[in-house]
Amino acid sequence: MEVGRYLKEGLLISLQQRLREFAEGIRKPTSSLKVHRQIVSLLEKPDPVILDIGCNDGSDARRFLQLRPKAQLFCFEPDPRAAARCRENMGPLDRMRLFEVAISDRNGRIDFHPSNGDGDAKEWDLSGSIRQPKNHLSEYQWVRFDGPISVETRRLDDWCSEAGLESIDLIWMDVQGAESDVIAGGKETLTKTRFIYTEYSDQELYEGQLPLRAILDLLPSFELVAQFPRGVEGDVLLRNTKL
């Protein structure tokens, strides 16, 4: 019993030290790959299970595979253009699987609002969302949105149950204002998820988008590990304190 307790305490101290080092490291300017490297160091295993929700062309997933070749990557992307590029970029990677669905709070079909851009950014597909654009239209006037398209959508809990995933090391999420939808459809899954990395905005870029404080309120078992602010927007890394 004593040995087990000391071992558990030692692992906890090790994780806390890594979290402090992570927080200290991000105070300095850092590259995207360095952020990925710091995150996988917190996972402390060679074969983590990672869900990339809103993966676009799969760039982040490929970075994780570069750092952890034995990782299992499950990628979700509802925009047909981005999904096609992701599938092409995947090539023969057998550790990375793509699902062309939107993750939300329901199963079935849902409207997706694809984005485009003006000028050199006419192929811009990084701002599409299942939520209608709102302040995004004035804040980023060079981005435009075409009429909605119907895409397949799944609840995270139902998808994970069918996939047979018993635990998840990291959810990497970029869903353009639909964070609360993912959370609502994934409450059971999140209880067995160790880390969440998500984009946020404290202005309502999309209809009904929640600010960071409200997102954190929906995740009471998660603590804020690190924040990467860009004005009133940014990204955060959260840790499940129950695991």
UniProtKB/Swiss-Prot annotation:
What Gene3D superfamilies does this protein's entry cite?
Vaccinia Virus protein VP39
GO BP annotations of the record are:
methylation
The cross-references to Pfam families, in alphabetical order and at most eight, read: Methyltransf_21
Citing just one GO molecular function, the answer is: O-methyltransferase activity
| Enzyme superclass (EC) | transferase
Q: Name one GO cellular component term.
A: cytoplasm
Instruction: Alphabetically list the UniProt keywords.
Output: Cytoplasm, Methyltransferase, Nodulation, Plasmid, Transferase
Give the NCBIfam families listed for this entry: fkbM_fam
Assigned protein family: Belongs to the FkbM methyltransferase family.
Role according to the record:
Required for 2-O-methylation of the fucosyl group of Nod factors.
Name this protein carries in UniProt: 2-O-methyltransferase NoeI
Organism whose genome encodes this protein: Sinorhizobium fredii (strain NBRC 101917 / NGR234)
Highest classification ranks of the organism: Bacteria, Pseudomonadati, Pseudomonadota, Alphaproteobacteria, Hyphomicrobiales
Q: What gene codes for this chain?
A: noeI
